Amino acid sequence: MKLLLDRTAVLFVGLAVGATIAMSFLGGGETLGSAQASQPAPSAAAAAGHRAAEAPAPRLAAAIAQGRKVEIGVFGDSFGDGIWAGLYHQLRRDPGFEVRQLSERSTGFTRYRSLNILDDVRAKLDRAPVDIAVLSFGANDTQGIFDQGHGYAYMSEDWQRIVTERVTAVVGLLRTRGAMVYWVGLPKMREARFDADIQAMNRFYAARMAALDVPYVETLPLSVDADGSYAPYLPAEPGRERRMARANDGVHMTIPGYVHLMRGLSDRIRGSVAQARAQAGPGPARPAASEG
């Protein structure tokens, strides 16, 4: 049984990746019985993340009506740090957005003895509400779970029940605060066994988000080559050198890799903001770009 296995190696690398991200910006219901990975159709990459814009939630509509910045909060683990970096890079030139890093490394929905994610999200929202919440967890959760004196194996029925309850509570909290919610899935992993566990995680969360009516942003098709295999480089662009997309650990991405994953989501967010502006009609001017 994969019961309470230590993901120390992943977490340690996450710390290094987080430091790299910071330095980069300073410088510039069913039981899933099997944890087997499914291979995406190569053509799925073009559509991954590029879906129709979602209708604006109450806080987003209010932000537009009031002419204030749209506050986006990214919650997650060390991979969430990278999602924040990619989304920040995509939206930073638009003065109408503020993208906040609210992720915590070494966390997950199986690790509530280290950090209760619901309590952490609530405390952060109490300090500074968000209009849009982007969630990405899972790299630390391919292990058993311990709850109320009992341990349960990864992807067992009780594991799924407990994680579903915890995730549902977090999504419910965000919605009661008026925020739009997105869930970002994980990309393909280099090591086959870990990848099988991660793709089982992706299927689990995709089903949970569908049940909660939360948009699920798929990143798997953007992280493979034409054969559906792990791709360490970004797709080649005419006249440009290929750029590395994955970190050396085979788990995390490089900054260009995270930016690549977030193109679709940033477009969807812009689309929702455009809808909110159209619904609001003439009103306060958009936030001006800050100097410097």
State where each predicted segment sits.
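Catalytic His-Asp segment of secreted/periplasmic serine-dependent ester chemistry enzymes
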Residues: K2, L15, A19, F25, ...
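Conserved SGNH/GDSL esterase-like catalytic core that processes O-acyl groups on lipids
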Residues: A61-E157
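Stable alpha-helical elements in mature extracytoplasmic
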Residues: F79, I83, L87, I117, ...
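N-terminal secretory targeting modules
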Residues: M1-G73, S272-G292
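Active-site segments of SGNH/GDSL-like serine hydrolases
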Residues: S136-T142, T168-R203, L220-P221
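Sec-exported extracytoplasmic/periplasmic mature domains
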Residues: G80, Y88, R92, G96, ...
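Second-shell loop/turn segments in exported
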Residues: V70-S78, S106-Y112, A153-R161, V170, ...
